[in-house]
Amino acid sequence: MNRKKFIYSGLGSLAIPLLFNNNFLVAREKYTRKIRIGIIGLDSTHALAFTKAIQQGVIKDFENDFTVVAAYPYGSKSIPLSIQRIPKFTAEIESLGVKVYQKIEEVLDNVDAVLLETNDGNLHLEQALQIIKRRKPLFIDKPIANSLEDAIKIFKAASKYNCPIFSTSSLRYLEGISTLDLSKVKGSEVYTPAHTEPSHKDLYWYGIHGVEMLIAIMGADCISVRTIEGIDSSLYIGTWSDGRVATLRGIRKGKDDFGGTVFLEDEIITLGKFQGYNLLLHEILKFFKTKIIPVDPTQTLAICAFIDAATESKEQGGKEILLKDIKKALE
């Protein structure tokens, strides 16, 4: 995968008498000051989990390199779960030494990089644009948006303002996925909890975890999706450009869990268990330090296209939906 590295221009020329001292001070600060992280949205459990891990210095390779210093609490003001969480999570994050501001701009004035953790994907475009225009390296937690259209706008803005961003689910790092020989993958069956929220298209709210797994395993060139609705689950059947087929089972009721099976040329692999957020957080912190994007935007956009097509199929009673038609409608 081609990874784009964003390089920032250095300081301009300085007066000769001040050159040594100023450069020395800048260099000293660069190598001694922790990278300051800001969080937008305190209605996600990820906001607290990430902050605790960073403040406690438990992420390998980056134990002393980062600190969360600022946060903006909102977050959805209409989703019941968010309304319930924000006051509690605000108090908890303040207890971790994080200053809470009432404007996103105030957070951006005091940080070097941003975690966009707002649970409501409908707000991500508006909030991301504020961050991107300030050129702050940005991680957007799932879902990147609530539509392919908004996701495209986010990436276009990032390109325009030369701002490094990426978005992914922690399930991309499920045990077994990263070690696959993707050239040998013939198909896959994965499963995920798929609880819904009225404000979001079907899989964007929670089932996106499973779509992330599917695209990470199969690749970004899915060409069609069909949705079959069951009583307690939904089955999503994807076809790829080379004829391969993969399925996603979205669990509506019953035991929640993540997992799956991958069919290779010479073996069948059962994926491991979800190990928490630290593998994802390691990639985020590495990204904040290097500005190298760990997940290709084409994969993120493929996830959104899959979900939009799955929603369309559901609304049309299980009709197979071509992703090219989803994309064409946005032209």
Regions flagged by a language model, labelled:
Residues M1, F20-L42, H46-L48:
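C-terminal segment of N-terminal export signals and the immediately downstream linker at the start
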Residues F62-E92:
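NAD(P)-binding Rossmann-fold cofactor-contacting core
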Residues R135, N162, G317-G318:
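Glycine-centered short loops/turns at secondary-structure junctions
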Residues S188-K255, L301-A302:
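Rossmann-like dinucleotide-binding domain that binds NAD(P)(H)
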Residues I144-H200:
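A contiguous active-site-proximal alpha/beta segment in oxidoreductase catalytic domains
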Residues V98-F155:
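Beta-loop-alpha module in the N-terminal Rossmann-like domain of NAD(P)-dependent dehydrogenases
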Residues G259-E331:
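C-terminal active-site/capping subdomain that shapes the small-molecule cofactor and substrate pocket
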Residues K5-V26:
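N-terminal export signals
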